[in-house]
Amino acid sequence: MSYQSGTNKIFYKKNLSWTNNFVKSNIDKIERNYKKHPTRNRWNCNCHVIHDDDLDVEYINFDYLRKKYEKIVKNVTKKYNIEKYHLSDIWYNYYKKGQYQEVHTHAGNGGVTAVHYLLFNNKEHSHTHFIDKNIKSPKIKQGDILFFPCDLQHYVPENETTVPRLTTAFTITKH
């Protein structure tokens, strides 16, 4: 499903039916990792982030995610007219009350960013916000994966609820 913002088609969104099963299989590990490193990340933000190359934490099934995402990426790259690409590392972002993600972009040489909403309640959580006031975020529900150009500045506002918000993210780097 594509979304228009202004005159540009910049978003691609798809709901992934396997999301809830993945969360059930991995949430206990994510919670234990959070208890060890509640604000661990490689950026200037207040959230818990674990990358697929972090070796000092319990490993969630990033291999499963990579296989599933690779299947989707083949179609997404066609929609964005990307012929040669590389799928970056994959990481998860776990936000509890008071946690947020700062304004940022993703390196990707003109590629595409993906955010998969694994635990997301649209009555409790905020969607990904974009700095450009002309860009309206599409409506998101749990299980959605959202693709957008990697150079769009975006952020996640502070989680004001006690309900955790969990996403995974990666970048499709253009060659």
Sequence positions of predicted segments:
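Short loop segments at secondary-structure junctions
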Residues: 16, 119-123, 175
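Catalytic core of non-heme Fe(II) oxygenases with the double-stranded beta-helix
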Residues: 85-157, 163-167
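Non-heme Fe(II)/2-oxoglutarate
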Residues: 1-83
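Double-stranded beta-helix
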Residues: 129, 170-175
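Glycine-rich loops and low-complexity Gly/Arg-rich segments
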Residues: 36-38, 116-118, 172-174
